[in-house]
Amino acid sequence: DLGGTTAKIGLFKTTGELLEKWEVPTDTSNAGEHILKNLAAAVQGKMQEKGLAAEQVEGVGVGVPGPVLDSRIVPIICANLGGWGKHNVAQELSTMLGGIRVLVGNDANVAALGEIWMGAAKGCRSAVMVTLGTGVGGGVIVNGKVIDGTHGAGGEIGHITVDRHETATCGCGKHGCLEQYSSATGVVRCMKKLLDANPDTACTLRGKDFEAKDVFDAARAGDALAAREVDEMASTLGMALANIAATTDPEMFMIGGGVARAGEVLFTPLVRHYKEYAFQSC
């Protein structure tokens, strides 16, 4: 799972049983030129540690935060990977790994498939996975099939426009994307704007260098301004999910990624706002 901050890696049996997991930092310097080399080194290191030869490894799957074509190619630059993209990731990584088969998919799409296969959505035919991390990703499965779309961009819900008056630019180059409000970076950005707009309001985050986790922690501890930001974020995300529900009518939404670790301080207002916006049969 290649993210903007870390790459999370797992060693699995072919039955889907997780044997071990670890992570390595994502080096996005120099337009991400070290990303695949570092991934290959991490995989090879674990293979050596476990005494695994290349022929004993069935394959390697990589989830990337952007569109993917034909389970091989990342056709555009990924907004949260420092300009990295436009690669035949499968071919390049396979070569680095001595010919091991490599398949590539959008991170949220493969997360959704994993949840339907072995996780929270096991048995579901239609579900939507939302990943809240450095960016916002989405994986949409309808009647058992991933919605890839014509250009591999199906489910890119982080780039749904939720504010057409936004002047700040998203990493994708557009304005007013969901990712600008509901990702970890978006929460920090919006919290800073709220602090600037309310200079006389007390807030435990004022004057500090904070992360999204700190905003949720402050809201949980009773900080009114932080709670206001969390509610705004939940409202924006709830509206986006309601719009997706009206289009795909999923059996469930699954929320993952680092921001989801906030727990009930996020999910309680999110469910409330979703119900406010959702079509009554969804």
Segments from the language model and where they lie:
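A short acidic Gly-Thr/Ser loop motif
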Residues: 1-5, 131-135, 153, 258
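ATP-binding/phosphotransfer module of carbohydrate and carboxylate kinases, centering on a glycine-rich
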Residues: 2-59, 68-74, 93-101, 114-124, ...
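Short hydrophobic alpha-helix segments
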Residues: 22-24, 79, 150
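Short beta-strand segments
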Residues: 61-65, 105, 129-135, 139-141
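Short, flexible active-site-adjacent loop segments at beta-strand->alpha-helix junctions, enriched
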Residues: 66-68, 79-81, 108, 152, ...
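A charged helix-plus-loop insertion that forms the helical arch/lid used to bind
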Residues: 73-85
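Short, charged low-complexity linear segments at domain edges
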Residues: 141-156
